[in-house]
């Protein structure tokens, strides 16, 4: 079964790669190179390919070429923008009439591929068992629940609220409990759901739908060469454990056994491991999966320090995941203490509390020494069980038990919380004259839309949430109020208002009635606060009416928030003026960092071509423009330092100026401050995009701005004063010292962005050799000279002539001219360079690896360098050969047929094709992706010969993924399949890197699935939308029906039942919903 939307996307990709157009035959060839098959026009119901293309006017434009042959061209237009129009009513403090409609084209910030800062709860609530008759053919319905079930919101880790995934609410249809009582008007309900989906999400999921492809038969299991012999297995097990004296995972034992002895490990042996105490010791370090046990040689038990019983028997402990035996026990371990000192425990607890999303154990020694100026005792890492009372310990890397993550235990004072809540309720009742209104609940979506009403203080910004349940509910309420008070309202007039009383207020110019609260009572006037619109006004007392009780049900819509990063400058006029001009009265997106009574947020304006970080823009308003680097045409500067050279020819320089002198003085004070402080207060515990902080660059503290977050532990930063990008762990960042905060914020960035005059700045026009030569020539030279030829104010880009001597009067001696005249500038065919330079490691120089090119200091003739890394596509490139053959990870372990597993649906095309991920192991994938980002973003661009069916790493947007190459286009684009998410992407060939064995330990997480309980059919787009709305991006429970094995993990397919157990009162079986939808559509057809 062909998916027409997938075909359209592939056709568009092929056509966009050819500017001159393609003939029908060439289109078929290019399409097959990309997808592995011809365009399936017959399967889509078209007699000819030409007929199919004519049905895609938004994709293909057909015309005749000079030879009379039909040519296909990509259609241009804005249909690819995929933007959503959001509308909301807006009031201003000057007018209380009928709210006007504010139209705003908003581009929703892309959500993370998964909850990167969260560890999924241990398990979801499991559904009730149902017989085959209850599920067969999709004739059953959602179960109605009356019994008490385990709360699905509980996190298996107990005290880490920040590590739970966000709730994923969905509007579920109300299903009848019995088939005969079918009173549902399904066609209209589903029609509304489909219509709403199309309006807010016009793009289609790019997933293959053909489940009828032939698959390679599964590999036969290795037979046992002899009957099961316990003694033989025990002797072999001793040999394996002797080679892994520090322990190994039980899940890895069958693979190691097979590699050593060319036989499968008998299943009976796995069941008897715990009884073979003379051979091995079995430990259970964490509870994320019951089969993840650690195995140690039995002889180690005599070397490990005797510990209390609860440490050695974690399976009987209340929190077994915190128990961990020493993996590096040595003969001197008896000298190690059995408990931490109170001072050491307090300091470690402070560090862990700073990183609520977890802290790598291996990072603890350096962080401890940097913070407290003393060395962490070695026994702490050797015996992590000593930390069990202040943190929980997890082991996300199966092949490396030493790579533990520590989570601080948060103990809540329940009595204090209850008393505080009671006090708030009493205060609310007094304020509302015994009438209560439910509190406003913060939207659960990742980036809610908000309307900024008032911004007179960054610590108290008044806003309203936009969307279902918020602005739309308010509109409905005010419509009801208008109808209600349109009757004889003289009897409803409020004669004696009192401060704090809720009331209804008639608008001045129109018939609107809105809710308000009395603030102050005067002679014949009152000052009221409009609780849904966030402003105050003095009005006549005759406009007050008694607020009927039925209008108390909706929470007050005007709420307050704090803008992150601006806490110390909340009243600065420059900040408030900027905020007023770019935020007030506009619909923005809010990223909620803290979900408190007054949430901490970052605001984004996504209505323009580029996203605008409102918080960062307000912070820049504090900068002293007189300290900026000078940009005057025809001016020459000496003692210039080139700090960065990008692959597109852009360079960053530091020019002597007052700003640079002041910056160096402040950074010197910063060094002294950190040397003298012994505290954890400077650690960055809550990073966010646009935040200004400090990180080490070449051993010294430098200013950075966070540009992107990859979860809670790995992030991208920009060294604003040198123009260098890097990927680091959050533990490497420090807050700007409070005494120096204003001075550092007010000093503009000192990296001057330049390009070489006369040479183009564009992707692909600079050869690798030209970039390398320029880096080798100018980096780390502090006395270059430059002359400004032109200034582009819009981009703040200076076109300059660059010299390595002080002879800047003669432009013929400039590096610009030398590059233009050299052979290095001759562009080689099929060379692709990224528009940005590679992200640098903080521990290496800014330049790439230095080649053998040597230039004197007098700007003499250019010498030809020795090529250190031949460009991509060079026939003589040995580095372009395929990488060493990887040992692919084992296939993902599935439960037995008929058993349940918790899953997350990452991609949903239709019931015949969707992709699952194991819910319990999602955090392991987060850890893996963070490690890949740190690894690949520090690598230089290298040639990689791309081949079909090759497994490698690919950079998609800002993340690195494990991918399978599906096809290669002639223009350098590569079609890849994400092995952990099940998505198809088109990426540049320069974004591919060899996948190292280190990243092949975790099984590929994507599981291709088909919904059981339904007859095979070709699903309509309406049915696909209904299915996606119910399952995509949601945690569900899957019951395994069958498995179609294959030779490769990504070819394996499963048939499952899906159950939504998020509602406590009933289970929703998805095949029931789809079967009922199909039945109703058949009846109405």
Swiss-Prot record:
Transmembrane parts of this sequence: none
Compositional bias segments (type: Polar residues): 203-216, 322-335, 843-853
Residue stretches making up the Tudor domain: 496-554, 686-743
Keywords: Cytoplasm, Differentiation, Repeat, RNA-binding, Spermatogenesis
The keyword Cytoplasm is annotated on this UniProt entry: yes
Pfam families xref list: OST-HTH, TUDOR
Residue ranges of the region described as Disordered: 112-183, 200-228, 297-341, 843-888
Any one GO cellular component localisation term in the record: ribonucleoprotein granule
InterPro entries noted in UniProt: LOTUS-like, OST-HTH/LOTUS_dom, SNase_OB-fold_sf, TDRD7_LOTUS_3, Tudor, Tudor_domain_containing, Tudor_TDRD7_rpt2, Tudor_TDRD7_rpt3
Compartment(s): Cytoplasm
SUPFAM superfamilies linked: Tudor/PWWP/MBT
BP GO annotations: lens fiber cell differentiation; lens morphogenesis in camera-type eye; P granule organization; piRNA processing; post-transcriptional regulation of gene expression; spermatogenesis
Domain HTH OST-type: 3-76, 229-299, 340-410
UniProt keyword Cytoplasm present: yes
Domain of life: Eukaryota
Principal place of residence: cytoplasm
A GO molecular function held by the record: mRNA binding
Physiological role: Component of specific cytoplasmic RNA granules involved in post-transcriptional regulation of specific genes: probably acts by binding to specific mRNAs and regulating their translation. Probably required during spermatogenesis.
Protein's name in the database: Tudor domain-containing protein 7B
Source species of the chain: Danio rerio
């Amino acid at each position: 079964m062909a998916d027409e939307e997938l075909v359209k996307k592939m056709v568009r990709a092929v056509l966009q790669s050819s500017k001159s157009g393609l003939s029908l035959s060439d289109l078929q060839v290019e399409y097959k190179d990309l997808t592995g098959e011809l365009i399936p026009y017959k399967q889509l119901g078209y007699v000819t390919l030409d007929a199919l293309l004519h049905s895609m006017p938004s994709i293909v434009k057909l015309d005749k070429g000079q030879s009379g042959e039909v040519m296909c061209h990509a259609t241009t237009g804005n249909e690819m923008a995929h933007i959503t129009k959001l509308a909301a009513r807006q009031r201003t403090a000057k007018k209380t009439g009928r709210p006007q409609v504010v139209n705003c084209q908003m581009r929703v910030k892309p959500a993370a591929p998964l909850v990167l800062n969260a560890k999924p709860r241990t398990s979801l609530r499991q559904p009730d068992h149902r017989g085959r008759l209850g599920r067969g053919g999709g004739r059953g319905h959602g179960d109605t629940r009356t019994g008490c079930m385990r709360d699905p919101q509980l996190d298996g880790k107990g005290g880490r609220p920040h590590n739970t995934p966000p709730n994923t609410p969905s509007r579920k249809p109300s299903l009848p409990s019995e088939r005969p009582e079918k009173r549902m008007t399904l066609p209209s309900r589903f029609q509304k759901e489909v219509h709403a989906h199309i309006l807010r999400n016009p793009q289609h999921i790019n997933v293959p739908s053909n489940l009828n492809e032939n698959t390679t038969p599964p590999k036969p299991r290795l037979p046992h060469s002899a009957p099961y012999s316990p003694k033989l297995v025990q002797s072999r097990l001793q040999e394996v454990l002797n080679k892994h004296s520090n322990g190994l995972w039980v899940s890895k034992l069958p693979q190691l056994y097979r590699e050593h002895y060319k036989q499968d490990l008998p299943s009976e042996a796995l069941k008897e491991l715990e009884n073979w105490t003379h051979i091995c010791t079995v430990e259970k370090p964490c509870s994320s999966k019951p089969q993840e046990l650690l195995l140690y040689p039995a002889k180690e038990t005599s070397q490990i320090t005797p510990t209390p019983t609860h440490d050695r028997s974690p399976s009987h402990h209340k929190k077994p995941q915190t128990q961990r035996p020493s993996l590096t026990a040595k003969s001197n371990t008896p000298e190690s203490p059995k408990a931490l000192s109170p001072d050491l425990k307090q300091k470690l607890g402070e560090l862990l509390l700073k990183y609520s999303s977890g802290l790598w154990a291996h990072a603890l020694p350096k962080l401890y020494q940097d913070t407290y100026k003393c060395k962490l005792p070695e026994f702490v890492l050797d015996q992590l069980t000593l930390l069990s009372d202040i943190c929980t310990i997890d082991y996300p890397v199966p092949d490396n038990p030493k790579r533990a993550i520590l989570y601080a235990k948060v103990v809540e004072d329940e009595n204090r919380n209850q008393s505080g809540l009671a006090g708030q309720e009493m205060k609310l009742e007094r304020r509302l004259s015994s009438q209560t209104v439910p509190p406003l609940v913060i939207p659960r979506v990742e980036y809610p839309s908000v309307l900024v009403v008032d911004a007179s203080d960054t610590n108290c910004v008044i806003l309203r949430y936009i969307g279902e349940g918020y602005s739309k509910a308010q509109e409905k309420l005010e419509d009801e109020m208008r109808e209600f008070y349109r009757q004889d309202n003289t009897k409803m007039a409020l004669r004696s208002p009192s401060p704090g009383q809720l009331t209804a207020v008639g608008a001045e110019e129109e018939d609107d009635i809105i809710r308000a609260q009395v603030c102050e009572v005067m002679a014949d006037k009152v000052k009221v606060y409009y609780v849904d619109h966030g402003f105050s006004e003095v009005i006549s007392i005759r406009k007050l009416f008694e607020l009927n009780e039925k209008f108390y049900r909706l929470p007050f819509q005007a709420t307050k928030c704090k803008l992150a990063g601006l806490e110390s400058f909340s009243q600065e006029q420059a900040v408030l003026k900027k905020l007023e001009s770019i935020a007030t009265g506009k619909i923005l997106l809010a990223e909620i960092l803290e979900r408190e009574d007054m949430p901490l947020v970052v605001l984004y304006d996504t209505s323009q071509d580029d996203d605008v970080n409102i918080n960062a823009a307000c912070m820049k308003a504090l900068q002293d423009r007189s300290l900026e680097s000078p940009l005057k045409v025809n001016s020459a500067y000496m003692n210039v330092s080139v700090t960065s050279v990008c692959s597109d020819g852009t360079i960053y320089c530091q020019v002597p100026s007052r700003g640079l002198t002041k910056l160096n003085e402040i950074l010197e004070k910063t060094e002294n401050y950190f040397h003298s402080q012994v505290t954890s207060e400077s650690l960055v515990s809550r990073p966010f995009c646009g935040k200004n902080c400090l990180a080490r660059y070449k051993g010294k503290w430098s200013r950075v701005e966070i540009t992107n977050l990859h979860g809670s532990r790995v992030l991208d930063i920009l060294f604003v004063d040198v123009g260098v990008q890097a990927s680091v762990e959050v533990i490497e960042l420090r807050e700007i010292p409070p005494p120096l905060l204003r001075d550092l914020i007010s000093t503009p960035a000192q990296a001057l962005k330049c390009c070489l005059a006369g040479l183009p700045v564009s992707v692909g026009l600079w050869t690798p050799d030209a970039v390398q030569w320029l880096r080798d020539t100018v980096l780390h030279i502090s006395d270059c000279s430059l002359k400004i030829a032109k200034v582009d104010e819009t981009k703040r880009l200076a076109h300059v002539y660059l010299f390595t001597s002080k002879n800047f009067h003669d432009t013929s001696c400039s590096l610009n001219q030398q590059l233009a005249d050299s052979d290095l500038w001759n562009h080689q065919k099929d060379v692709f360079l990224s528009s940005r330079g590679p992200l640098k490691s903080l521990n290496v120089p800014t330049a790439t690896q230095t080649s053998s090119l040597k230039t004197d200091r007098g700007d003499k003739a250019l010498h030809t360098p020795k090529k250190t890394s031949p460009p991509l596509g060079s026939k003589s490139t040995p580095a372009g050969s395929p990488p060493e053959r990887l040992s692919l990870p084992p296939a993902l372990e599935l439960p037995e047929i008929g058993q349940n597993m918790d899953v997350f649906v990452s991609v949903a095309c239709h019931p015949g094709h969707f992709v699952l991920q194991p819910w319990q192991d999602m955090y392991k994938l987060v850890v893996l992706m963070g490690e890949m980002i740190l690894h690949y973003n520090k690598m230089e661009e290298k040639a990689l010969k791309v081949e079909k069916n090759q497994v490698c790493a690919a950079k998609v947007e800002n993340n690195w993924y494990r991918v399978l190459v599906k096809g290669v286009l002639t223009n350098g684009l590569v079609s890849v399949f994400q092995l952990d998410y099940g998505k198809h992407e088109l990426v540049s060939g320069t974004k591919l890197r060899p996948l190292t064995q280190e990243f092949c330990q975790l099984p590929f997480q994507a599981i291709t699935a088909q919904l059981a309980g339904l007859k095979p059919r070709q699903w309509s787009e309406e049915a696909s939308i209904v299915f996606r709305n119910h399952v995509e991006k949601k945690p569900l429970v899957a019951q395994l029906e069958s498995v179609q094995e294959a030779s490769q993990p990504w070819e394996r397919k499963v048939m499952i039942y899906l159950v939504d157990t998020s509602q406590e009162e009933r289970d929703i079986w998805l095949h029931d919903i789809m079967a009922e939808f199909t039945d109703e559509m058949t009846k109405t057809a």
